[in-house]
UniProtKB/Swiss-Prot annotation:
Compartment(s): Nucleus
SMART domains in the record: B3 (SM01019)
Entry GO CC: nucleus
Claim: Transcription regulation is one of the keywords in the record: yes
Domain of life where this protein originates: Eukaryota
Protein's recorded name: Putative B3 domain-containing protein Os04g0346900
DNA-binding feature ranges: 25-118, 140-236, 320-427
Region feature Disordered, mapped onto this chain: 253-309
Chief location category: nucleus
Any matching Pfam family: B3
Amino acid composition bias (Basic residues), ranges on this chain: 263-273
GO molecular function: DNA binding
Record keywords, A-Z: DNA-binding, Nucleus, Repeat, Transcription, Transcription regulation
């Protein structure tokens, strides 16, 4: 959407860097959307004397042939939002929960790029120019990936992107080239199997060399002939400027960061990752028993059943927690989560949490492939003294709709405090 420049991040007016921000859309984003202070300042919004909010109007370019006026305002706490007109803009372009948007300000216009649940750039109006021939960078195909646990050493290219933009001749190649933000080119092996197409050998080394880590979001712009140019956004949504910030570059020396394996029974980073610290697991779950004479204690049988729900989790820029589901969880319709984990992501009071599942379905045709869609459930998250819980009718419905069984493992990745992506590892 809108006109866009190079992902490398050029200068704006008067030599100032152009403000860029990546946002993930949560249910509340469709009424108003929080933006960073730098972007708000470039849109002309500051805090007046006495802390009184100031408002401005941003000109948002749309490929649908209309220029949208969207209000920018700070609330009483000084936080900046896109407000009046934003809900109409989002509805007109079909933006959805779990999508990513990139906001770029330049030339007096706010441009918006939207990546849907396929992780591909959503095309509005005319399709992107044929890969390799486009001279306007805004017309080149793009996709993004969130670096989550388990995909650091091998990254899957979205099936839709492969089907739409990568030719059969290119797929016969065993090598892709990545143009890094430092101006270097990297050769990465192209792996293919029945499940999809991946960036394989050399990918982890590329990440390690550039200091790109878990929780970062990488956007790939396709130059054609298996050549990709990338830009990187940190978990705070700000684009990383490798040159200006002097990010330390290091070679893998045997101590490079390793993606956690969900088959392991502990995590390597003791400061950020913990196993079996479900603080509530040795406590009686709320509303789970009646009239116990040993308050605060569980029977040996109950303790044994509850131990199976212990978790592996990581607290970090892109926090995640892995939980094994057992009969106790399904019968009681309540799932305990480690107190430390909940506190770290800002879940400190009862909240409505959106659980999102990405569904991939096979498509028919000469080239085959798959398409993706998202489904979501509203679940109550409740904080108690020693733990927090997902519970109630929403959690029951989630389990029923997804056929969750005893022995399955749910991996919750926190995209936002109240928006979690869920992947289910079947037993």
């Amino acid at each position: 959407m809108g006109s866009r420049g190079d992902h490398g991040g050029g200068g704006g007016g008067r030599g100032a860097a152009r403000a860029t921000q990546l946002k993930v859309l949560v249910p509340s984003s469709f009424r108003k959307m929080r933006i960073c202070d730098e972007l708000a300042a470039q849109l002309g919004v500051g805090v007046g004397g006495g802390g009184a909010p100031r408002a401005a109007t941003a000109r948002v370019a749309s490929p649908l042939g209309k220029a949208w006026d969207v209000g920018v305002v700070r609330d009483g706490d000084g936080r900046a939002f896109l407000g009046r007109g934003w809900a109409e803009f989002a509805a007109a372009h079909g933006l959805g929960v779990g999508w990513f948007v990139v906001l770029r300000h330049g030339g007096g216009v706010l441009a918006v790029e939207a990546f849907d649940t396929t992780c591909c750039l959503r095309v509005f109006g005319a399709p992107p120019a044929e890969a390799g021939r486009a001279t306007d960078t805004s017309r080149k195909p793009q996709f993004l990936t969130v670096l989550l646990p388990g995909i650091m050493d091998k990254m899957r290219i979205p099936d839709k992107f492969v089907r739409d933009y990568i030719t059969g001749e290119n797929l016969n190649s065993n090598m892709a080239i990545i143009l890094s933000p430092l101006g270097k080119s990297w050769r990465v092996e192209l792996d293919k199997d029945q499940s999809g197409v991946f960036l394989g050998g050399g990918w982890l080394q590329f990440l390690s060399f550039h200091g790109i880590s878990r929780g970062d979001v990488v956007i790939f712009r396709y130059e054609g002939n298996l050549v990709f140019k990338i830009s990187v956004f940190g978990p705070n949504g700000r684009q990383k400027d490798f040159k200006a910030k002097g990010i330390s570059i290091y070679q893998g020396t045997g101590e490079q960061q390793e993606a956690p394996s969900f088959s392991r029974r502990k995590c390597n980073n003791k400061k950020k990752s913990r196993f079996g610290e479900d603080d509530g697991n040795q406590q009686e779950m709320p509303c789970s028993r009646k009239g116990s004479g040993n308050k605060g204690r569980t029977s040996d049988r109950e303790t044994k059943r509850m131990r199976k729900t212990r978790s592996v989790y990581e607290i970090g820029p892109r926090s995640w927690i892995k939980k094994e589901i057992n009969e106790y969880v399904l019968e009681r319709c309540i799932l305990s989560l480690a107190r430390t984990f909940c506190e770290s992501i800002g879940l400190v009071e009862e909240s409505s949490i959106t659980l999102m599942m990405i569904d991939t379905t096979s498509t028919q045709g000469d080239q085959g492939g798959s398409s993706s869609s998202s489904r979501s459930w509203e679940v109550t998250g409740r904080r108690y003294k020693d733990a927090c819980y997902l519970l109630g009718a929403g959690w029951r419905r989630f389990c029923e709709d997804n056929g969750v069984r005893s022995g399955d493992v749910c991996v919750f990745t926190v995209l936002d405090t109240t928006l979690w992506r869920v992947d289910i590892e079947r037993c």
